[in-house]
Amino acid sequence: MLGRSFGRILCFATVLFLGACSSLLSQASKGMARDFATAVLNEDDPQLVREAAPSYLMMMDALLIHHADRPELLLADAQLNSAYASSFVDDPIRAKAMSAKALHLAFSALCLRHPSLCTPQQKSVDQLSSSMQHMDKGDVPLLMTVGTVWAGWIQLRAADWNAVADLPRVRLLMQRVVEIEPDAQQGAPFLYLGAIDTLLPPALGGRQKQGIAELDEAVRRSDGHDLMAKVIMARQVARTNYDRPMHDRLLNAVVAADPHASGWTLENCLAQDEARKLLKSADDYF
């Protein structure tokens, strides 16, 4: 549904990490961290990233031992745990545990920045909306992180309607990002909005037409590089509507595309892996 964006999320987490640690790192260390994120984004071997990322996760946990009051560090650690759980952890129990840890970290950062939002799951959509009206461009990294981590937590509990009931709150966070800074992360808010709006069929409250438009907008704002948007459209629109021609057309286009694009290579390789799996299972599904 909403995961598989590890490369982009790692880059975003590194920006948060550098902001939090500006007084702790030398210029050389900051440069190395940026270069590490760039290397990951442009890596075309997801398995290599899968094997290397745990060291980065452990480093973030170590930094939080003495700096748990720094929202940027909490957000960076939350992003990494969530993205790794969604993209690389096959054991559902372990993935759920990592996503729960990530959500706790994200909510802790939200509480530090905005004490009135310490328990967002307990607020109604109207209460949450009212509490976010004062937020501005400086809050976009916070909103994006809480939204993506929360979405990842829901994704791993898709069979739990109590978890799925949180989707309107996640949508509200992403909509607020679009209102403040629509080009954040090259259209990422539209990717998440589209994934949320196409998750359910119209009969159950889904917004298929709106979701398709949002996924198309995500592709447009990425200059055509975002292959994951097409995978989501195939999985959540074409399959829901039992539209085999649309399904195969989208996925074959993803598989045939050159995944190599600066800042998009890893995510596109993950999208192609997912596209191949969906194509392989298509005969059984349809």
Region spans (language model):
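Alpha-helical adaptor scaffolds
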Residues: 182-223
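Alpha-helical protein-protein interaction modules
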Residues: 212, 231, 235-240, 244
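C-terminal motif of bacterial Sec signal peptides marking the signal peptidase cleavage site
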Residues: 17-20
